[in-house]
Every structure is written in structure tokens, then in C-alpha cells.
Regions:
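N-terminal hydrophobic targeting segments
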Residues: 1-31, 159
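Tandem CBS (Bateman) regulatory domains
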Residues: 1-15, 64-131, 143, 147, ...
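Residue-level detector of functional hotspots within protein domains
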Residues: 3-5, 35-37, 53, 106-109, ...
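Short N-terminal micro-motifs specific to bacterial/archaeal maturation
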Residues: 16-19, 58, 114, 133, ...
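The conserved cystathionine-beta-synthase
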Residues: 19-46, 68-75, 132-150, 175-179
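Residue-level signal for alpha-helical context at structural boundaries
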Residues: 27, 46, 50, 85-86, ...
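A glycine-centered beta-loop-beta connector
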Residues: 32, 43-65, 146-149, 154-169
Length: 192
């Protein structure tokens, strides 16, 4: 794996779904949909949108889970029900309580409409220290960062600039192909 460099597997920012920090959640969904359509034919689809400031610098990331979380009702009663699990209630008991409570919540189309108008900055996650990897880092370094931080992607840097995104799916594909190639060579009696 050491023969791969991060920059060989990353998706350049120019090819990734991005929106300005002034965008709404709906605009971010449209950007993700467009990027998935354009990228689908060649590689794995995008699963996040990068949020850019007015200087085109990455200030956050909005994942599919962040999108879905934006549609969850946000009120104290529901938050208290979610906390039942830490008091020993089973996941099933918590889900049943949530379902019962949600029967009286607003219609889902109203929830979608309200969330769609909110700014992406309300739901995005700002990158943390462990989410950056240098473009010249070896793939094994990136693999460690992905697994140690349970990250689905890493932001690829050149000096202080973010130039791309390294996705778990692309790393997995590279590792899988390297493993397959290595095993086939061993099966044929070759040594490295």
C-alpha cells in the first residue's frame, strides 16, 4: 500500500459537490444530486457536500447523515426519549416511544419544507484535526487516519489549502485491488 500516495486516489475539490456557506439545505441537496449524476458513471457516488466560505475555502462538510438528521424533529421531549437508552432501556423500547411520540408531530412534508429553507451552516460539521491528510502522505497513513477516527473521508491538503477529499470507498477499492493482486502473485509462486 505504501506505493500509493493520497493525491492519486483523492477527488479534487473541482469535481466534488460544493456549496457556499450561505446556501440552504435544499441547495446543498441539489448540489449533491448533480455531483452524483456527473460522477456516477466512473466511480463511487458522492456522499457529502463541502461547504465553502466567500474565499472558496472549505469550512465544513455536510454528510448524508447530517442531511437526514436535519429532518428529525428537534424538541426536548424527543431528546429525552432518545436518552432512555443510557438508563438501560432497550433500543426497541426507545424506538417504540419515539414512534408513539412522533404520531402527533407535524406532517413530514412540512418538516422537509422547513428544513430545506435553513442554512447549511446550521447542520454542517466543521473539520477536526484528525480529518486532514497531506496529499503526499502514503495510503497506509491515510488508512490509519480513516480507521482510527472512524472517518468516511479525509480532507486532502497542500500546504494550508484543502485541495481534495479522500473517500473511504476509494481507499477500500485500492486496498482490495492491492490485496487481490498480491494474493494472485503468491498463488502463482511469485515473491515480491
Amino acid at each position: 500500500m505504501k506505493n500509493y500516495k493520497v493525491k492519486e486516489l483523492m477527488v479534487p475539490i473541482a469535481e466534488y459537490a460544493t456549496v457556499p456557506e450561505t446556501a440552504t439545505l435544499f441547495e446543498a441537496v441539489l448540489a449533491l444530486e448533480k455531483a452524483q449524476e456527473q460522477f456516477q458513471a466512473t466511480r463511487y457516488s458522492h456522499r457529502a457536500v463541502l461547504v465553502l466560505d466567500k474565499n472558496k475555502k472549505v469550512v465544513g462538510k455536510l454528510s448524508q447523515m447530517d442531511f437526514l438528521s436535519a429532518l428529525e424533529p428537534q424538541d426536548t421531549n424527543l431528546e429525552q426519549i432518545r436518552m432512555f437508552k443510557q438508563f438501560g432501556f432497550t433500543r426497541k423500547a426507545v424506538v417504540l416511544q419515539q414512534e408513539e411520540y412522533l404520531k402527533n408531530s407535524p406532517p413530514i412534508l412540512d418538516v422537509y419544507s422547513k428544513a430545506a429553507k435553513n442554512r447549511v451552516t446550521q447542520y454542517m460539521r466543521r473539520p477536526t484535526e484528525g480529518e486532514y491528510v497531506n496529499e503526499n502522505a502514503s495510503l497506509d497513513v491515510a488508512l490509519h487516519q480513516l480507521t482510527a477516527g472512524s472517518n468516511l473521508s479525509l480532507l486532502v491538503t497542500r500546504d494550508k489549502d484543502i485541495i481534495g477529499i479522500l473517500r473511504l470507498a476509494d481507499v477500500f477499492a485500492a486496498v482490495y485491488h492491492s490485496m487481490k493482486e498480491s494474493e494472485l502473485k503468491l498463488a502463482d509462486g511469485e515473491t515480491e
